[in-house]
């Protein structure tokens, strides 16, 4: 049995953090329950036996740390709610486990926290930095919108996507906070959202929410150079849709991207050691607004959360040879679910 967690909005019926048990032998979820009620816990991160979740209380915003026990149940360690500048949308941890990074979409800012490397607790907010870059012409790009922050494969920087400014910004970082390093621009109105790095550290898959495209980019010393791009929806689809999550299979052979509105998952074959992508197929996600999904460590199953409609959680069996997925379970619900982790 594999334990997993789903983060959610708490605007309507969402509970914050759900816990589920994935039965990999039967390709289904045997249990899905409220794991911990945490307001606005829209993104989660697991670091061994500690889980971090976006959180807010009133006007105070930040991140909470929780201990995962032997049964997969969650227990609060502490919270660091040191800002009034808005709730985050992404969290990640540095390789040395000393720092936690947070991206805040609404305010267009990034945050950096100090961590206790022994307990995983959050010690303090080190810095909150606002983006101030020229924005695109799309109506959603009225100001900068930091959407992702994570350490680069070389370990030297953090890379931040800005959906409002159509770019990736890299920063040096230390005990004092962030220092601007380089920026890589993409097309106007792309709405650059997330990055998934290939294990070789040379190539990155950059997804753009507004243009519904994925770019293959070569990464080198804080800079991203686009090599090619692919549409993640059918060319003849003219409905309202927005790209959401991106994940690589653990064997690095296939890339998966979810589309909210078209309600699908696009599957690409990874070619030439990560340098190229080739569309395999686009499969219905089995629900409405597939905000996030994740792939079990065995590479056999994919679990997808749907933010809208019935908020069904779908489980797909995955063919390791073709990359294709087949729906096998849609009996569980996680209201307002927007993040899936194992």
UniProtKB/Swiss-Prot annotation:
Cellular component GO terms held in the UniProt record: cytosol
Secretion signal, residue range per the UniProt entry: none
Membrane-spanning intervals of the chain: none
InterPro entries linked to this entry: Cycloisomerase_2, Lactonase_7-beta_prop, N2O_reductase_N, WD40/YVTN_repeat-like_dom_sf
Species, as recorded: Staphylococcus aureus (strain MSSA476)
Taxonomy, superkingdom: Bacteria
SUPFAM superfamilies the UniProt entry points to: Nitrous oxide reductase, N-terminal domain
Protein name as catalogued: Uncharacterized protein SAS1845
PANTHER family: 6-PHOSPHOGLUCONOLACTONASE, 6-PHOSPHOGLUCONOLACTONASE-RELATED
Family the UniProt entry places it in: Belongs to the cycloisomerase 2 family.
Gene Ontology molecular-function annotations: 6-phosphogluconolactonase activity
Stored Pfam families: Lactonase (PF10282)
